[in-house]
Amino acid sequence: MSFTLHSVFFTLKVSIFLGSLVGLCLGLEFMGLPNQWARYLRWDASTRSDLSFQFKTNVSTGLLLYLDDGGVCDFLCLSLVDGRVQLRFSMDCAETTVLSNKQVNDSSWHFLMVSRDRVRTGLVIDGEGQSGELRPQRPYMDVVSDLFLGGVPADIRPSALTLDGVQSMPGFKGLMLDLKYGNSEPRLLGSQSVQLEAEGPCGERPCENGGICFLLDGHPTCDCSTTGYGGTLCSEDVSQGPGLSHLMMSEQAREENVATFRGSEYLCYDLSQNPIQSSSDEITLSFKTWQRNGLILHTGKSADYVNLALKDGAVSLVINLGSGAFEAIVEPVNGKFNDNAWHDVKVTRNLRQVTISVDGILTTTGYTQEDYTMLGSDDFFYVGGSPSTADLPGSPVSNNFMGCLKEVVYKNNDIRLELSRLARIGDTKMKIYGEVVFKCENVATLDPINFETPEAYISLPKWNTKRMGSISFDFRTTEPNGLILFTHGKPQERKDVRSQKNTKVDFFAVELLDGNLYLLLDMGSGTIKVKATQKKANDGEWYHVDIQRDGRSGTISVNSRRTPFTASGESEILDLEGDMYLGGLPENRAGLILPTELWTAMLNYGYVGCIRDLFIDGRSKNIRQLAEMQNAAGVKSSCSRMSAKQCDSYPCKNNAVCKDGWNRFICDCTGTGYWGRTCEREASILSYDGSMYMKVIMPMVMHTEAEDVSFRFMSQRAYGLLVATTSRDSADTLRLELDGGRVKLMVNLDCIRINCNSSKGPETLYAGQKLNDNEWHTVRVVRRGKSLKLTVDDDVAEGTMVGDHTRLEFHNIETGIMTEKRYISVVPSSFIGHLQSLMFNGLLYIDLCKNGDIDYCELKARFGLRNIIADPVTFKTKSSYLTLATLQAYTSMHLFFQFKTTSADGFILFNSGDGNDFIAVELVKGYIHYVFDLGNGPNVIKGNSDRPLNDNQWHNVVITRDSSNTHSLKVDTKVVTQVINGAKNLDLKGDLYMAGLAQGMYSNLPKLVASRDGFQGCLASVDLNGRLPDLINDALHRSGQIERGCEGPSTTCQEDSCANQGVCMQQWEGFTCDCSMTSYSGNQCNDPGATYIFGKSGGLILYTWPANDRPSTRSDRLAVGFSTTVKDGILVRIDSAPGLGDFLQLHIEQGKIGVVFNIGTVDISIKEERTPVNDGKYHVVRFTRNGGNATLQVDNWPVNEHYPTGNTDNERLQMVKQKIPFKYNRPVEEWLQEKGRQLTIFNTQAQIAIGGKDKGRLFQGQLSGLYYDGLKVLNMAAENNPNIKINGSVRLVGEVPSVSGTTQTTSMPPEMSTTVMETTTTMATTTTRKNRSTASIQPTSDDLVSSAECSSDDEDFVECEPSTDKSLSTSIFEGGYKAHAPKWESKDFRPNKVSETSRTTTTSLSPELIRFTASSSSGMVPKLPAGKMNNRDLKPQPDIVLLPLPTAYELDSTKLKSPLITSPMFRNVPTANPTEPGIRRVPGASEVIRESSSTTGMVVGIVAAAALCILILLYAMYKYRNRDEGSYQVDETRNYISNSAQSNGTLMKEKQASSKSGHKKQKNKDKEYYV
């Protein structure tokens, strides 16, 4: 049949319960009298419900039914108008009317049903339906009144009735019966002028043998499907033969004709040889399933077809005879049909009349469209599924059936097709696709899966769809946003080179955004975005989604609501490649091309909720099994909604906002300064001084149409760049900056290079006021296409962008300074202040950068809430000053600067102008004065500080003037405000003078200006109305002594001279700070040490000692700063040469820091057990070892100590020797001595490995300022030391700290800072780092470290080879002899008192020598002894500290020389005494032992050295007693390593001659010792 297909669909839902009351049910007879009525219990018609009854009448007007909300807005009224039924209803004061097509005043019985479905209300008369739909604000009807039939009581006051005049409407005249609410009968509350009527259409029980009577076209009809009889009245026996055996055989045959379908199988019967052409048909079958949706049976094509399916657990029938589709849905009263029980279906058609019944009880009857009565099909009969179910005409579902089908039979007047039996016996016309099993087996349920976190997802196989395809699934969630499905094709270059997005891909996606479901599709010619829901779908209920596509066109259905779509362009092919992602995207998206239109992907919104019944092209996907196979994190195989609200337990910390999600709470940490699931982790802070920035470089060019940006900031400046996206190829930017104390948002989308409307300039929004108050402020930006929203604290600004272009391109996210300046005309001012919690589209970039989670971060800013002193300049005298360009402050002004001084008075700033206009800022008697004249005479505002400000501390000054002429002066935290009337503009001209004036200008100053001299002190962070001048380079004129930096007047060790537990060492002309064990660097140990960030993929920094320069040590010192969040990883490991097995390892285990080392036999472990260190905060760990003794300390926490059990080595040796036979004494003694060596000496160190990658225990985070026995390996790595190799994810932060010293305060290299020597002979030393001086920095060799010295203990009688670099190993001898030091042991040391001036000690030649040395340098007593640190909480340590010292020596064949080492107090590194575990001691000097060339030589050396030791001691004592004969003066220039003249060995070598010759002239001088 070829007729025009009319898209006429209507749904008939009728449920008839048959029992004893059906035929006997009493009706109501209405006489049409005034004030007649029948009152029933209230019908709940608020959302979804049905009401039905039967009636007959012969009148054309009358009120049938009425209900309302008590006189407000809502009502529903059924009445007769001109013989037709009129439905009139209102919701939320929106009203509509529906009128039936059929005349009903014909004295025949008619069936009427009113169906409510939220905003839609339907009217069905005898199977023909119409509906009306409203668009109210709320999607439900308020029902307050009872239900009235036939009329409304007159005693109800009119104001309580919503519909005016309803009481005056004529009453109904006729019969009504079988009133039902759904399938239940309501209770009659009362009536008036109404009679009971026993007559009914089925009152005479016409059906026999248990047949069911129902109305059809107003006449009683019998349903005989459950009786075994046929005929009009179920009176004809239709059994096929007599006898019980036939019935048993028939039952057996029925049981055998069963088949199991699992979603991919189906049966196909070919009708091409015997086409169907019938006017009446019957289909019978039984099914059993857990599945909610699936095709059961289909035949026909185009406009002639029959489709039977399960749809959301109900049975759906769609029939089209050529003039339009008839659709019927049969639902059970309770539950669904997918309950895994058998259900029987019978469909009968006679001409246009169609009846479908399920289980013989639930019956639906209706009519097809117009007058077509013939069904024709020459196609196929599909059972259980089809090759492409979504493409079948009229198919309401897209997937195949899963479950069991039994006895599928089709018959008409001509043929009977037992389809199940034909498939089982293998009929030639029946094709079986897939593995169909002809018995009923259990089919695994498609269990739902629950995505518990936004990061959870699973991968699905490639979707092989080209021209057509279908996807269906159910989802359930309460969260408004989430990416549900995404897949894309192969990248292709766009032909238009001007396009901003130069690669394109076909893609398909489904996302939930703001509660609405969207389909996104691109088939090569542009993206379409289809909104598939009219109301929000995140209400926690299940929603069924069915997507069907044929070429460019298709439909997406959500709960039967269909939305058509058509793709752009001409292509009908969707070319996809790779996996399809369900629930979200993988963390590593390097291979993905994410379309800008897919906002959930750009914003990192993963789906949190449940998914079930996923079918792709009609075939089921067992997503639970896929999740288990992929071990998908955060995916569970169940779906239940928690009843309790998750936020009721207040899980969010630090004042974070809690939101209820899907079975979870969501903590919004914005504005708290914390992050984490419960906002429990403190976010990292970056400090900016105007020259610093953080730049995140995207791994690829980014294109977005939606952004979420949030952060906190704190600043005292009114101007400065906060955050900006920048592009290398366009002017595109999303920029946030401080502008006059407000936050300014500017979004500029460049239209130059792409085909879009010309840009109308950047969109700009402002929010906030006076934000430069040095308090934390929270900024949020939300952009969705053209919509912009800026929130600063509680101030909200919103805007809409003009034009059609919404795509933002960027390569970088920049903070502090904008480095990408090619496409901007005005560069924003640099930022001075602090940033925290920068989150851009779900990524917390500051913490990601700090922890090494991203490898594309350029970091020049400093971590931590630091006191920011930007670009300080020192004005050394009161006559010093400089001039800058005129201050531009005509209408408003924001000035900021910092100062530090000891002078009570002085000019800070002055600028004159036209007429009397001027501005001056000065210090008067220690207080700030702000003096100005705008033309109305001079005014002065005085700061109200609590005390004078000339206290040599930094102070902050903010001066503002707004458009209302309100002036404010803020000094530190004290504010003074004054409103000035009159002139508002400040018209300045001439130069701006800083820190003073030219000498002749002081006599011509305006009134109220008190200063007559310049400012002496330091100025920093100068901000002149948004301009950050460089006071030195931008100066137009300079006069006097002006220097960059601010050293201050202190030249002696003060309590705060050295920061971060650095050790202050008093020098001749100042002091130096030993920063070696602090992880910091700089003159005062307040600059970060060389810092590397190790990424999550692991990295390794490997230092290898040269083969001939490998040290062996008795004691070691190790310090490093770190921050990390990993629970397990190796920070540093030092290994001996292959085969020896000695090692030392610093690691984190279960979040706690520990050290394990082995120096001979067993592993020795020491651990900080109290507190985990993987909290993301910065920690400094210090480790010391002396033999088997060790200490470990984190920050200022208590020290952890380890001492070996037992007595000293010698005591143990003597005990053992008493029990050994005499002849075995010698070999046993040699063996025990060798074991003793192994227990105390770290032999032949070969390499230092940093990062743990070589051992498989990766460290992730940052490491800073690593120090080990004189080596700063990270500094060496930053300087590209040839002995260091770097591989993996390792990134240097910023630059290697450059250090410049001054004559006042210098800083020695940390590894050399403890090598100030006091000896009885003059010895040369070597340095292993760059010397810091004011003039220049001279590089030296890094090769000679601790390996350059030879140790001096009982194990040192092995051969020591001199360094091969003669220029760096030089000895100087005076008096014509070589000095030798005796052997020493730890027992020789006592806690002797030494000079408070130098804090140095000597190795003990004798107690008298120590006392003499101490007393010889007691003349200089500063305010605080050198060696004092700013750390009062630590316990005092013993005074004697011997630190590692690289020294040079000479070796001859008979005499051993050893350096004598002095060191200042080092209180912050507690160490252990190797022989006295009961007393806390610090170790001796780092002892370095060369590798022995042979064991035999060592044994011989021990015997020889014992005698030699005695001779050396006697010789030293003799020389001491005769010191006057060989006296000399120790030249301080040789003893201070920090002196630039000795910063490398070559210079020292050149001085040898003068040193020797000068010795004779000094022979008769008094003894002098400089320390």
From Swiss-Prot:
GO CC terms of this entry: cell projection; GABA-ergic synapse; glutamatergic synapse; presynaptic active zone membrane; presynaptic membrane; protein-containing complex; trans-synaptic protein complex
PROSITE patterns found in the cross-reference section: ASX_HYDROXYL (PS00010), EGF_3 (PS50026), LAM_G_DOMAIN (PS50025)
Residues reported in the UniProt entry to bind Ca(2+) 2: 732, 749, 807
- Chain residues that bind Ca(2+) 3: 1142, 1159, 1241, 1243
The protein's matches in SMART domains, at most eight in alphabetical order, are given as: 4.1m, EGF, LamG
GO molecular function list: calcium channel regulator activity; metal ion binding
For the Cytoplasmic compartment, the record's topological domain ranges are: 1518-1571
Q: State the source organism's domain of life.
A: Eukaryota
- Domain named Laminin G-like is located at 28-202, 258-440, 447-639, 685-857, 871-1046, 1090-1290
Annotated function: Neuronal cell surface protein that may be involved in cell recognition and cell adhesion. May mediate intracellular signaling.
Please identify the protein, giving its name as recorded: Neurexin-3
